[in-house]
Amino acid sequence: MSDLRDPAPYDALLLLSFGGPEGPDDVVPFLANVTRGRGIPEERLKEVGQHYFLFGGVSPINEQNRALLGALRKDFADHGLDLPVYWGNRNWAPYLTDVLREMTTDGHRRIAVLATSAYASYSGCRQYRENLAESLAALEAEGLEVPRVDKLRHYFNHPGFVAPMVDGVLASLADLPEDVRAGAHLAFTTHSIPTSAADASGPVEAHGEGGAYVAEHLDVARLIVDAVRAETGIEYPWRLVYQSRSGAPHIPWLEPDICDHLETLGAEGVPAVVMAPIGFVSDHMEVLYDLDTEATAKAAEIGLPVRRSATVGDDPRFAAAVRDLLLERAATERGRAVERCALGSLGPSHDLCPVGCCPARAPKPAAAGADSPYV
């Protein structure tokens, strides 16, 4: 095997995701896991769970992750990469601690981790690292030999992540009626987070209004707009907007909300909109409910034609990007200088989260960072 195709020192890859219910009886326990420590009563969890009950109590994220797991295994096998791929979740089965225990008993000692979150933020990165540290501490308490885990860098601007989204936007534009297509507006959506969390996202030097979270999304949106212009010859107007807000109404979150944005566009006479969920790797419940159900209903109410572009999901180009990220990090860990693939103005993200990156309100141990107790 070529040195640059060698996964060493890694002996396994962990696909780490959020998790979701697989049936109606799972919904409230799942939401209790998501909100643990906040003292939210069960009746309120049942209210929040209505989004899931509309879809039979099943989150689409699990099937999406199974498909991505299969795509990764196929890509690795097709390219002669003999590396097992496991899947674990933060909030539902297969639980992270159980999967790390399985990996440890299977003999794996150096594990690369791919989180299904492409951008910098507390909830999209450090919280995953905190959960990894909690699970490693649990294994240590059981007397098991604790493996080293390394989280692969943020991939928001990797060509294998961006290209499928470009194709999705182009397909959605082509699906619009011809008489409104050229005048369409592109609404790039991502999960809203508190403005304080956005401002503190990424390394300390990126902190400020919007932080790395907003800057990274804007960079991806510009990449897509440029690629669409190159393909169509049209400079489509666009904006980064937000969705899926939760929490107390008095706490500022990133705005505008997608539904408010659609109302504004309708009032301005915009003839059509493509909603592009660039903040989501796959069709989460936030995509199926907040965009396909709620935002689409709002657009119909005001007579605005909309299309929702596809997420990356298990696109073979994304699976290849994961392989590239893995081999890049492996070579770096072996002391090799390698090309780090990235598009846009921000360049490739860091391998090791520095101290102060995406800080938590209450400091907790986090794995796979410069401040990690597990190295």
Curated annotation (Swiss-Prot):
Keywords in alphabetical order: Cytoplasm, Heme biosynthesis, Iron, Lyase, Metal-binding, Porphyrin biosynthesis
Binding-site residues, Fe(2+): H191, E286
One GO MF term attached to the UniProt entry: metal ion binding
Pathway: Porphyrin-containing compound metabolism; protoheme biosynthesis
Catalytic activity: Fe-coproporphyrin III + 2 H(+) = coproporphyrin III + Fe(2+)
UniProt xrefs under InterPro entries: Ferrochelatase, Ferrochelatase_C, Ferrochelatase_N
GO CC terms: cytoplasm
One annotated GO biological process: heme biosynthetic process
Keyword Cytoplasm: yes
Residues that hold Fe-coproporphyrin III according to the record: S59, Y128
Coarse class of the protein's main subcellular location: cytoplasm
Location of this chain's protein in the cell: Cytoplasm
Pfam families, per database record: Ferrochelatase
EC numbers for this chain: 4.99.1.9
Domain of life (superkingdom): Bacteria
Family matches, as CDD domains: Ferrochelatase_C, Ferrochelatase_N
Function: Involved in coproporphyrin-dependent heme b biosynthesis. Catalyzes the insertion of ferrous iron into coproporphyrin III to form Fe-coproporphyrin III.
Record family assignment: Belongs to the ferrochelatase family.
NCBIfam families: PRK00035.2-1
Protein name (Swiss-Prot/TrEMBL): Coproporphyrin III ferrochelatase
Originating species: Streptomyces griseus subsp. griseus (strain JCM 4626 / CBS 651.72 / NBRC 13350 / KCC S-0626 / ISP 5235)
